[in-house]
Amino acid sequence: MAKMGGEEDYPLYFGAGPELLRVAAGLRKSMTPAEKVLWERLRRKQLKGYRFRRQHPLYRFVVDFFCYEALLIIEVD
């Protein structure tokens, strides 16, 4: 299990396998223009102190943005 600094234990990737982790890493390197704009607003806890992760693997999917604290997924199309 992975941990975020100071938070309780939780399964950060919720069962995502190694291949999906590699796919997510590749997607982080090739974000769309819309994803880049939103990421500039979400990164470094700029949104009320919430921490977001980009191109985050969950189960069998890679979500554009994920905030565990708020249990929030954001998809940009």
Task: List each model region and its residues.
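Solvent-exposed, charged helical/coil patches
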Residues: 1-53
